Regions:
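Membrane-interface helix termini and inter-helical loops of multi-pass transporters
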Residues: 93-101, 150-161
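Transmembrane alpha-helical segments of multi-pass membrane transport proteins and ion-pumping complexes
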Residues: 18-31, 54, 76, 80-92, ...
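Pore- and pathway-forming membrane helices of multi-pass small-molecule/ion transporters and channels
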Residues: 23, 36-62, 113-155
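Alpha-helical membrane segments and adjacent membrane-interface helices in multi-pass membrane proteins
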Residues: 41-90
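Non-transmembrane, aqueous-exposed alpha-helical and coiled segments at domain scale
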Residues: 67, 92, 96-97, 103-122, ...
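Alpha-helical transmembrane segments and their membrane-interface boundaries
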Residues: 2-60, 160-170, 174-184
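Short, highly charged, low-complexity non-transmembrane loops/tails of multi-pass membrane proteins
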Residues: 190-201
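Hydrophobic alpha-helical transmembrane segments
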Residues: 12-16, 69, 73-77, 106-110, ...
Length: 201
């Protein structure tokens, strides 16, 4: 019986497919796609964070896409939810008190400490959120999205509208990252080819 060793070969280099998909993210910052006051103003960096995270979590290999999606998406949402809870506490409780800077910073720290408890304890007890890095993708992305003024409904609006817009926007942007990682590999049309001179009896 002849055994032939094989290796994987990219029909289209992933450097090309990845760069092509990355280029599509410019649409996320276009504020002229929808009529005002609506606007598509998603944070592109949120896509790249979870795009890299997709491969770090084990994606990219044959049959690994679905398990990696399951590993990441609920955990990202969990982090996003508690980011929103922290944002509401910082903006609508501490921010409305008119306190001195030292006291405000102290209370800010307490809020962050409290919202991190369900995040960190939850990983011990609930299987779908055990992949801790993905939780913090969502948590950090919410804060950077909100305080940077990004969102699908940005601008000088009601604060509640803006903060919930940031919550939804952050999750959608993070959710696109693993899809981009999957498509990067899929578009490369990877196939197995024999290694030259590897045939053995």
């Amino acid at each position: 019986m002849v055994k032939i060793a094989t290796r994987t070969k990219e029909t289209i280099p992933t450097a090309i497919t990845g760069a092509f998909i990355a280029g599509l993210t410019v649409v996320m910052t276009a504020s002229v796609v929808l009529p005002k006051p609506w606007a598509i103003l998603f944070p592109p960096w949120a896509v790249f964070i979870t795009w890299a995270g997709y491969f770090a979590a084990g994606g990219g290999g044959k049959g690994q896409a679905l398990p990696t999606f399951k590993k990441m998406y609920v955990a990202i949402l969990w982090g996003d939810i508690w980011g929103l809870a922290g944002g509401l506490g910082l903006v609508f409780i501490v921010g409305k008190m008119g306190l001195s800077l030292p006291l405000s910073l102290l209370l800010d720290g307490i809020v962050i400490f409290l919202v991190n408890q369900p995040i960190l304890w939850g990983t011990r007890w609930w299987g779908p959120i055990k992949y801790t890095p993905a939780i913090f993708y969502g948590f950090a992305t919410f804060f950077s999205t909100y305080f940077s003024g990004f969102g699908f409904y940005p601008g000088p609006l009601d604060q509640y509208t803006t903060i919930f817009s940031a919550f939804i926007t952050a999750y959608i942007a993070n959710a696109l990252g693993p899809i981009a990682g999957y498509l990067q590999v899929r578009f490369a049309m990877i196939k197995e080819v024999p290694v030259e001179g590897s045939a053995k009896n």
